[in-house]
Amino acid sequence: MEEKNNSKLKLTTLAMAQIAVSAALLCVLSPLAIPLPIPVPFTLQVLVVIMIALILKPSYAIIAQLIYTVLGIVGLPVFSGGKSGFGTILSPTGGFIIGFIIASFFVSLVKEKLKIKNSVLRYILSSVIVGIPCIYIPGIAMYMIFVKTDLLTAIVTLTSVFILIDLAKCVIASLIAVPVNKALAKIK
């Protein structure tokens, strides 16, 4: 009986470690931003968000995203460009932060429900078909509100700049997630 309890404790400890490392990755990599002529900079956030979603269970993925978001809201400079505060959520880039939370949960959920295991192609498809829309829809909506532009202009502006790069990030995240998941399977 004791062995079973230790196993549960190990899983709980592993889950906490995965969540902590994921939140830390977001906090370290998200502030790195390359400014662009539009109010949304180039970052590695999509890559990290998708990678986390492909590695963690849905509940763990969303917890990691929420930790990152709360840390940014309370004042740690973890959002793109080292920004922080609730005002960042209420800005042209705020919808993307909301989208990261949504995407991390749904990409992970699709991976789990469809029993996608260590298939780069299936990881890419799930992250592109589910993750990108989950990120872009609230991102475009908030951009429209705060930049005061119409839907078509917002879509063209944001997708023309980011879509190919974000698709590449989904591929890279998938390539990273497969060996990480294989290694984690050996630990469990």
Task: Write out the residue ranges for each language-model feature.
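Interfacial aromatic-anchored transmembrane helix boundaries in multi-pass membrane proteins
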Residues: 30-41, 69-103
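Alpha-helical transmembrane segments and their helix-entry boundary regions
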Residues: 61-65, 123-124, 154, 170
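Hydrophobic transmembrane alpha-helices
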Residues: 2-62
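Short helix-perturbing small/polar motifs within transmembrane alpha-helices
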Residues: 2-6, 14, 19-21, 28, ...
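Generic alpha-helical transmembrane segments of integral inner-membrane proteins
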Residues: 20, 24, 28, 51, ...
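Interfacial helix-loop-helix junctions of multi-pass membrane proteins
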Residues: 76-82, 142-156
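Membrane-water interface at transmembrane helix exits
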Residues: 30, 34, 107, 111, ...
